[in-house]
UniProtKB/Swiss-Prot annotation:
EC number: 1.14.99.46
Keywords, comma-separated and alphabetical: Flavoprotein, FMN, Monooxygenase, NADP, Oxidoreductase
Similarity comment: Belongs to the NtaA/SnaA/DszA monooxygenase family. RutA subfamily.
Top-level class of the enzyme under EC nomenclature: oxidoreductase
GO molecular function (one): alkanesulfonate monooxygenase activity
Pfam families, A to Z: Bac_luciferase
InterPro entries registered for this protein in UniProt: Luciferase-like_dom, Luciferase-like_sf, Pyrimidine_monooxygenase_RutA, SsuD_RutA_monooxygenase
Residue sites binding FMN per the record: 79-80, 145, 154, 170-171, 220
Name of protein: Pyrimidine monooxygenase RutA
Triggers of expression: Up-regulated by the nitrogen regulatory protein C (NtrC also called GlnG) and repressed by RutR.
PANTHER family on file: ALKANESULFONATE MONOOXYGENASE (PTHR42847), ALKANESULFONATE MONOOXYGENASE-RELATED (PTHR42847:SF4)
Function summary: The FMN-N(5)-oxide reacts spontaneously with NADH to produce FMN. Requires the flavin reductase RutF to regenerate FMN in vivo.
Length: 393
């Protein structure tokens, strides 16, 4: 069994500036942490210098069980139906979200599990029934992430792209979709009639054992308005490299949108963690990954991001394709020593409206271990948790 380095790292705390929290931050001192599992090949680094691997159930099982051991609160998988190509064949190889998370629900016991529904591909009544099934498998630990779909070739290859006017109507579509879901989960029946869906005494039973959580990742005004009305929380991108609070205006917009509906909808922020013993060592990793950027795959991403001419400049895909840090789709990136990353995550927790983070790693298995043993014990916003060492195999 590997012993924890917590004692040595704790000696470093005094040298690292810490935040002063106010009394209202008691909830934030328990900031939620999730793992964005690598359902697609190579995770979230579009680089020939990054670890190259295929997505498998066994890999994701090991990741989520390790995350559960270190008291991560949730695991989320995306859905991707066509990749970016290039030398790395980035995201050309993907598992399916609901079936993967059903399997992971069966081999975990505490961690919350979220699958993503590509709503153009799955009727809401089928999603309602699949979700109720995974609720049964997990003992009430399951929820659904709803996405409208932005990458036209994913759907065009199957002949189900509804036309480019969908870009401007996609949240109208999603609004009807979630209303059908809520009917079926809440009452077991739906007679909803709308522009996109017509239910005729549609039935789903058994219903979920607990209220089913719905999450979304709206960053546009329309997306945030949807989340404010229907989601339990909203994902947003972190921004920049080692600028942990740069997303604050996005969280503020989400809070403002939620105030209009009288609901409490917090922001969960997406970050990549690249950590090492020292700041310099971590920075060297990051520079190495950037130097190997797969330009062909990145060109595909840029091309697809330009096809939505109906939405504004504030959509997720616009940020993903920004050339600044496109090598990891421009998610917020925290690069540094274990103590530095812990400090930056505490800064994330200080932002009003930030209720959690969704983390990716350059190397998931070792990254979760070092996070659990070297980073999390230094975080004020996770101080309620016990210090753990690596689990015995």
């Amino acid at each position: 069994m590997q012993t924890s380095h917590y004692a040595a790292e704790k000696d470093m705390q005094d040298a690292v500036p810490r935040l002063t929290f106010t009394l209202r931050d008691e909830e934030r001192l328990m900031m939620k942490i999730g793992v964005f599992v690598p359902i697609g090949n190579n995770g979230w680094l579009i680089s020939t210098h990054a670890p190259q691997y295929m997505p498998t159930f066994e890999l994701n099982k090991a990741i989520v069980q390790k995350a559960e051991h270190y008291h991560f609160d949730f695991a989320l998988s995306m859905i991707k139906l066509r990749g970016f190509g290039g030398k790395t064949e980035f995201w050309d190889h993907n598992l399916e979200s609901f079936t993967l998370m059903a399997g992971l629900a069966a081999v975990t016991s505490r961690i919350q599990i979220y699958a993503t529904a590509a709503t153009l591909t799955l009727p809401p009544a089928i999603v309602a029934r699949m979700a109720a099934t995974i609720d049964s498998i997990s003992g009430g630990r399951f929820g659904v992430n709803l996405v409208t779909g932005w990458q036209k070739p994913e759907y065009e290859q199957m002949g189900i792209w509804p036309g480019d006017d969908y870009f401007s109507r996609r949240y109208d579509y999603l609004t009807e979709y979630v209303q059908v879901l809520r009917d079926l989960w809440g009452t077991g029946k739906s007679d909803f009639k709308g522009d996109f869906f017509t239910m005729n005494d549609c039935r789903v039973s058994p219903q979920p054992s607990v209220p089913m959580k719905v999450i979304c990742a709206g960053q546009s005004d329309a997306g945030m308005a949807f989340s404010a009305q229907y989601a339990d929380f909203n994902f947003c991108f972190g921004k920049g490299v080692n600028t942990p609070t740069a997303f604050a205006p996005t969280a503020a917009r989400m809070k403002q949108a939620a105030e209009q509906t009288g609901r409490d909808v917090g922001s969960y922020v997406l970050f990549m963690v690249i950590a090492d013993e020292t700041d310099d060592a971590a920075r060297a990793k990051w520079e190495h990954y950037k130097a190997g950027a797969d330009e062909e795959a990145l060109s595909w991403l840029t091309e697809q991001s330009q096809k939505d001419t109906r939405s504004g400049t504030d959509t997720n895909v616009r940020q993903m394709a920004d050339p600044t840090s496109a090598v990891n789709i421009n998610m917020g990136t925290l690069v540094g020593s274990y103590a530095s990353v812990a400090r930056m995550l505490d800064e994330v927790a200080s932002v009003p409206g930030a209720e959690g983070v969704l983390l990716t790693f350059d190397d998931f298995l070792s990254g979760i271990e070092t996070f659990g043993e070297r980073i999390q014990p230094l975080m004020q916003c996770r101080a309620h948790l016990p210090v753990l060492t690596q689990e015995v195999a």
